[in-house]
């Protein structure tokens, strides 16, 4: 008997979040403008199965509100924002943006999605760190 590997179908919104994290990471490491990052991303990435409108909104709005997002999460970090791993920083910024501004998305969905994205892109225990921070941020934003 052979074991069949069952791949979960990744939702268009999950793919949008993954793309937004990648774009935020690129923005952070390249220091290029968000508009330039978005333009390059849209031209160069395979966006099949991605909710591109949601990706664009997440990336643009997270970048635009980065100072507010950072100020929300700073009290719950164990280090300076500048010392965070760039991937963890991108994931946390995106999730905190969603918790604060995307009120139609339940907080549990935001946290779960951030954990799943951290499992894909982050270091071995990134998902635990992301979960710990977001679990403290959500109640402060009256989302829990």
Curated annotation (Swiss-Prot):
InterPro entries: NusB-like_sf, NusB_fam, NusB_RsmB_TIM44. Keywords: RNA-binding, Transcription, Transcription antitermination, Transcription regulation. The keyword rRNA-binding does not apply. CDD domains: Terminator_NusB. GO terms for cellular component: cytosol. GO terms for biological process: DNA-templated transcription termination; transcription antitermination. GO terms for molecular function: RNA binding. It comes from the Bacteria. It holds the Pfam family NusB. Belongs to the NusB family. Involved in transcription antitermination. Required for transcription of ribosomal RNA (rRNA) genes. Binds specifically to the boxA antiterminator sequence of the ribosomal RNA (rrn) operons. HAMAP family: NusB. This is Transcription antitermination protein NusB. It comes from Pasteurella multocida (strain Pm70). The gene is nusB.
């Amino acid at each position: 008997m052979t074991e069949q590997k069952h791949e979960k179908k990744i939702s268009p919104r999950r793919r949008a979040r993954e793309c937004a994290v990648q774009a935020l990471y690129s923005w952070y490491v390249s220091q290029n403008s968000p508009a330039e990052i978005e333009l390059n991303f849209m031209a160069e990435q395979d966006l099949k199965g991605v909710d591109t409108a949601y990706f664009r909104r997440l990336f643009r709005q997270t970048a635009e509100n980065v100072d507010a997002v950072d100020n929300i999460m700073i009290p719950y970090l164990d280090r300076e924002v500048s010392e965070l791993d760039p991937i963890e920083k991108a994931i946390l910024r995106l999730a905190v943006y969603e918790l604060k501004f995307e009120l139609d998305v339940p907080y549990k969905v935001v946290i779960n999605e951030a954990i799943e994205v951290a499992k894909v892109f982050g270091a071995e225990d990134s998902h635990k760190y992301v979960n710990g921070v977001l679990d403290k941020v959500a109640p402060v934003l009256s989302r829990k």
